[in-house]
């Protein structure tokens, strides 16, 4: 979950995303109840569903315009009842390009979500909630990259050809684009955005788990910035390269015997609630 690496360490990202969930199953499995119990006044709650609400499985399926909309209304109303601030997102695009009569892929993407894209926007307008058009953001990104290069964003590994779920690179890029759009609409969070070319994090919220891995993989040409997030790492690798600027969060400790450093106090929380593993969360 890459969102934490896009924000300062004043923001706690509490990720409640669960793969394969719809608004219906998220509620029925008591996942929403657990989020609601944790919300404090001033928390931001990011809500994005749709991919799994589309499925025919009766445990998952909802209808746009009726049950899907009603569940989104529930999330908004109950978040506000706890003093939280809901933010609605629609579904990111699937990497599905049109084929022409010659069997060749064009640069046009097929809409696989239909009216499920409209419900979050409709409820946001109805309830006066911030809406982030993740479908447009990711549509523009994938279309610009084209049929071949866009595979670099998704889980194309070996024989696996997954055009729905992002890999680490894709998740980092999409999270960065998403939080930039959030920052435009929510100035309080916009002030907390940080921009680095690469992030190292022990909890999987970055591009690499270790600084050593990052230094091995980063291209040598050009300048770049690297953020090392709070956590305990092995011995700090020797490093001399004036073109690479490394920033360490408070709470970074080096050396296999180093004790965990105490994490700094946070005063912003962000909670994410999502029905697939690409995006998810809750917040303060």
Predicted features and spans:
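Serine-esterase "nucleophile elbow" of acetyl-processing enzymes
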Residues: 1-17, 33-41, 254-284
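N-terminal, post-signal-peptide region of Sec/Tat-exported proteins
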Residues: 1-25, 218-232, 236-240
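Active-site-proximal beta-strand/loop segments in catalytic clefts of secreted hydrolases
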Residues: 15-21, 47-52, 89-93, 133-137, ...
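Short, flexible loop segments at the rims of nucleotide/cofactor-binding pockets, characterized by
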Residues: 21-25, 107-109, 202-205
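N-terminal post-signal-peptidase region of extra-cytosolic proteins
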Residues: 23-34, 209
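Alpha-helical cap/lid subdomain in secreted, periplasmic
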Residues: 30-168, 172, 176-190
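Short aromatic-glycine-(Arg/Gly/Cys) micro-motifs in beta-strand/loop hairpins
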Residues: 195-201
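N-terminal extracellular ligand-recognition/capping segment immediately after the signal peptide
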Residues: 203-213, 222-253
